[in-house]
A protein has these predicted regions:
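Canonical positions in the second alpha-helix
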Residues: 39-40, 73-74, 108
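TPR alpha-solenoid repeat register
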Residues: 50, 84, 117-118
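Structural marker of alpha-solenoid helical repeat scaffolds
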Residues: 42-43, 77, 94, 111, ...
Length: 238
C-alpha cells in the first residue's frame, strides 16, 4: 500500500494549488494548466484537490459540464470537501438549479462552521476590530449620509444562518444590509448591518481584513443609497 504523502509534500501541493488559483485570478490560463500538471505529477490525476483544480479551469473556460463532473468526482473521494461543495453551489446557482445550489451551500456552511474553533475564528480582539472598522466606515461618510445611518445597529454573526442559506444566500458572504434598498427620503433607515465575522477572518488578516470590512460595509450601504452592481463595481465596491 502506498504511503500517505508527508506534511512537506502536502505543503508543496498546497502551494502549487494556490499558484493555480492565483493564475486564474490573473487570467493566466496557461500558468494555471502548468500548475495543474505539476499537482497531477505529485498526487495523480484522481486526487480530489487535482479534480478541484481541473474544475476551476473548466469553469474559467465556460465548460460547466466538465466542472460539475470533476467536482462530483472530488466529492465521491472526499464528501467533506467544503470548497468543492461551494463551487458546485455557485455553478448550480448560475444554472438556476436552486435546489441543488442550496443543498451544496448548506453543506458548505456546516463544514466551514466545524473548522471555526480550530482556525480560531472567534478571537474576541479580531471580532471587536471588525466592529470598530465598520462603525468608523459609517462615521467617515459625508454628513448627509452618515446621519441617516448613524443609529443603524451593526450586528456580528459568525456566518449566515441556516434559514438564510436555505433561501439561496451565499454561505461565504461577508455581510448583509437588511432594509430598503433605495436611498429615498420617504423610506425609513435600514434595519441593520450584519457582518459575518468567521467568513471575513477565514479570508483576511491585519490590513487586508480592515480593507475588506470597509469594502463590505460600503457595498451594502451602496444598495441602500440606490447604487446597482455596475455602479459599485465602477467605484471598487464589488
Amino acid at each position: 500500500m502506498d504511503k500517505p504523502p508527508s506534511n512537506e509534500a502536502l505543503d508543496k501541493l498546497d502551494g502549487v494549488l494556490s499558484d493555480l488559483e492565483l493564475c486564474l485570478a490573473d487570467g493566466d490560463l496557461e500558468g494555471a494548466r502548468s500548475a495543474l500538471e505539476a499537482a497531477q505529477e505529485m498526487v495523480g490525476p484522481g486526487d480530489p484537490d487535482v479534480r478541484f483544480g481541473r474544475a476551476l479551469i473548466a469553469q474559467e473556460t465556460g465548460d460547466a459540464e466538465t466542472a460539475v463532473r470533476e467536482l462530483k468526482l472530488a466529492l465521491e473521494a472526499d464528501a467533506d470537501f467544503a470548497d468543492a461543495h461551494y463551487e458546485l453551489g455557485l455553478i448550480f446557482e448560475e444554472l438556476e438549479d436552486t435546489s441543488s445550489a442550496v443543498h451544496h451551500f448548506l453543506r458548505t456552511r456546516a463544514l466551514d462552521a466545524r473548522l471555526d474553533k480550530e482556525r480560531k475564528l472567534d478571537d474576541k480582539a479580531e471580532v471587536d476590530r471588525i466592529e470598530r472598522v465598520a462603525r468608523e466606515t459609517i462615521d467617515a461618510l459625508p454628513t448627509e449620509f452618515a446621519e441617516r445611518l448613524r443609529d443603524v445597529p451593526i450586528l456580528l454573526e459568525p456566518r449566515p444562518s441556516r434559514t438564510l442559506v436555505e433561501t439561496g444566500f451565499d454561505p461565504r458572504a461577508f455581510g448583509l444590509f437588511e432594509g430598503p434598498e433605495h436611498g429615498r427620503d420617504d423610506v425609513p433607515a435600514p434595519t441593520r448591518i450584519v457582518l459575518y465575522t468567521s467568513n471575513l477572518l477565514a479570508n483576511f488578516a491585519d490590513e487586508e481584513l480592515e480593507e475588506q470590512v470597509e469594502t463590505t460595509v460600503m457595498h451594502e450601504v451602496g444598495h441602500y443609497f440606490g447604487l446597482d452592481e455596475d455602479d459599485m463595481e465602477r467605484l471598487g465596491l464589488d
